[in-house]
A protein has these predicted regions:
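A glycine-rich helix N-cap at a beta->alpha junction
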Residues: 74-94
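Internal, conserved structured core segments that host functional sites
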Residues: 90-147
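Short catalytic helix/loop segments, enriched in acidic residues and glycine
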Residues: 22-46
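Extreme N-terminal starter segment of soluble prokaryotic enzymes
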Residues: 2-6
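Glycine-rich loop at the start of a catalytic domain that most often binds anionic cofactors/ligands
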Residues: 64, 68-77
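Short acidic, Gly/Ser-rich segments with clustered Asp/Glu that frequently serve as metal-coordination loops
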Residues: 13-19
């Protein structure tokens, strides 16, 4: 990892302390709590990455429109990216020279009966399958990012 740039994808449903749907809904008191926990989770990752020798960290706030991380509490060494972009990497936009990606706070895939708030991208999509196998967002995102 020495000298590399990390691209950290942050989602809310799988972050520390998110255990009800209200935690994922913009503007609720629970959402504010979840934002604080997600920011702490990401700060722990950022700190660990820098301790491991990376030269930079880009954090993509990927839950909904991407306004979940709290900028004033986020480790200042991380570059925060919000919003949804059509390219060059679908959903991600620019990758800022990242060498590898990490996924934090992702959740169960659509169609997973035992997972917490299971979905893939949106609850309107029942599930996504590739070659007959149901895939989760981390698999989908890894396949998108692998092209870059």
């Amino acid at each position: 990892m020495k000298g590399k740039v990390a691209y950290v994808v942050a989602d809310l449903e799988g972050s520390t302390g998110t255990w009800t749907k209200a935690h994922t809904l913009l503007g609720t008191p629970e959402w504010q709590e979840a934002r604080e926990e997600l920011t702490r989770d990401i700060n722990a990752v950022v700190e660990s990455l820098f301790e491991a020798g990376v030269k930079g960290v880009v954090v993509k706030d990927f839950h909904r429109a991407g306004y979940n991380l709290i900028p004033r509490y986020l480790d200042g060494r991380a570059k925060r990216v919000s919003g949804y972009y059509s390219g060059p990497a679908v959903g991600y936009g620019k990758l800022y020279g990242a060498d590898f990606a990490l996924f934090v706070g992702l959740h169960a895939s659509g169609g997973n009966e035992s997972g917490f708030l299971p979905h893939t991208l949106t609850s309107r999509i029942a599930e996504i399958r590739v070659n007959g196998k149901r895939i989760c967002e981390s698999e989908l995102f890894a396949s998108i990012l692998s092209a870059f």
